[in-house]
């Protein structure tokens, strides 16, 4: 992983992670009309309605379920068990954290990805230890930030930075993984997972801005904020927009249900607007109309496709195969994006959104996220190429294995049919 990723991390927050090997029972299947994509071809109803999760490794490459399961287990051992390559570390107080090996800190990004991985893989003990660490060390329990989580801490649990701050994607993955935990394990153990999720959902929408801290979502645009304070409240990070998760919040939240019902389509519009009309590339940060945006005096050019932006393909692909409500737009977006990378011979990592000024080397995280984006492709040859690249990619090692590794890990779960809506 390039050194520049590590430097960029100082100014933003990222991560990706989640796993699962076993099937899940649903509480029922709902009817859903068949969608059509831009070519007029029917799109299978989303997995939320059918409980059918496709293994693209099997479909495109002929890889057996046994081979797939074995690979997922290897990835779990690599990142959660092996002393030389893991990013999961346990502490003496019955807690655990996901370690950003490049920046040598602990982020809500990684903690929430780790929890999602654990609930998907039925690893309750590890899930509880991660959540215990997050609540003990990251949660603000008083003051204007009360209810939010500090976006990064030292491995010893000390919040970093002079001023409190959160990173919105951490709360988003916390909430969704806690809902899944509630549905998978019940609420009678160490935690009432449902109430934990409901509390965060309520807390992050209880800030009126009078003390300088706002709601996690901008109440006018219905979009998740980059950070719920100052000017950042009026901007977003396209990769924080997870319409598939927000669909579930609208169903499961006890509070603000009418508001949450408006957020999935707002997120879908933002992703469509932020995707460049020729290249499909997304910026790291954007205005609410999708225009690339860079905060004043920021440490790098966030108008480029660089660090956070690679996750957008994963968000789009997940929404496509979970719900399929914006199939035509999502097929077009992923066709533009993945054809652009193919024309670049899958060579570079960073670009201006118009495709100019390429730099870096095509990364493991990009390989993963783009394979998830391939769910939305009509071009089966291109989809197969992206999926083959993911299967063949070596497990990330070294100092910068955390970010690319977590995106890679979640992507493997998605593409293998193991990243599921646990109802």
Where are these regions (language model features)?
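Aromatic-rich carbohydrate-recognition surfaces in CAZymes
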Residues: 104-111, 160-185
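Extended ligand-binding clefts on enzyme/binding-domain cores
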Residues: 36-74, 81, 104-108, 143-150, ...
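Short glycine/serine- and small hydrophobic-enriched flexible loop segments
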Residues: 2, 115-122, 173-184, 244-248, ...
């Amino acid at each position: 992983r390039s050194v520049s990723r590590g430097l960029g991390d100082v100014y933003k927050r990222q991560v990706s992670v989640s796993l699962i090997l076993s099937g899940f029972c649903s509480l029922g299947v709902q009817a859903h009309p068949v969608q059509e994509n831009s070519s007029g071809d029917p799109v299978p109803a989303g997995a939320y309605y059918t409980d059918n999760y496709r293994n693209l490794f099997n479909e495109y490459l002929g890889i057996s379920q046994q081979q797939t399961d074995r690979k997922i287990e290897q990835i779990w051992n690599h990142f959660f068990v092996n002393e030389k390559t893991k990013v999961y570390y346990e502490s003496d107080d019955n807690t655990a954290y996901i370690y950003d090996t490049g920046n040598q800190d602990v982020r809500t990004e990684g903690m929430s990805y780790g929890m999602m991985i654990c609930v998907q893989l039925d690893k309750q003990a590890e899930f509880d230890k991660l959540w215990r660490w997050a609540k003990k060390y990251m949660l603000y329990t008083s003051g204007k930030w009360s209810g939010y989580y500090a976006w990064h801490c030292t491995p010893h649990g000390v919040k970093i930075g002079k001023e409190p701050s959160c990173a919105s994607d951490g709360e988003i993955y916390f909430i969704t993984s806690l809902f899944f935990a509630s549905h998978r394990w019940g609420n009678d153990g160490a935690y009432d997972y449902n109430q934990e999720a409901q509390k965060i959902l309520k807390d992050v929408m209880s800030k009126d801005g009078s003390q300088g801290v706002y709601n996690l979502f901008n109440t006018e645009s219905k979009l998740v904020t980059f950070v719920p304070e100052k000017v950042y409240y009026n901007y977003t990070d396209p990769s924080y927009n997870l319409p598939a998760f927000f669909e579930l919040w609208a169903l499961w939240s006890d509070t603000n249900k009418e508001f949450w019902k408006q957020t999935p389509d707002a997120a879908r519009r933002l992703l469509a607007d932020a995707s460049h009309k020729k290249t499909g590339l997304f910026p790291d940060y954007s205005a609410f109309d999708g225009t690339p945006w860079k905060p004043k005096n920021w440490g790098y050019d966030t108008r480029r496709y660089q660090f956070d932006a690679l996750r957008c393909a994963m968000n789009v692909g997940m929404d496509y195969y979970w719900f399929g409500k914006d199939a035509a737009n999502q097929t077009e977006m992923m066709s533009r994006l993945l054809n652009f990378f193919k024309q670049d011979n899958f060579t570079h990592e960073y670009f201006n959104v118009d495709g100019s000024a390429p730099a870096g080397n095509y990364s493991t995280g990009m390989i993963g996220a783009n394979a998830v984006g391939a769910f939305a492709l009509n071009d089966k040859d291109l989809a197969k190429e992206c999926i083959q690249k993911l299967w063949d990619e070596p497990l990330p090692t070294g100092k910068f294995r955390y970010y690319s590794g977590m995106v890679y890990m979640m992507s493997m779960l998605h593409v293998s049919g193991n990243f599921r809506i646990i109802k």
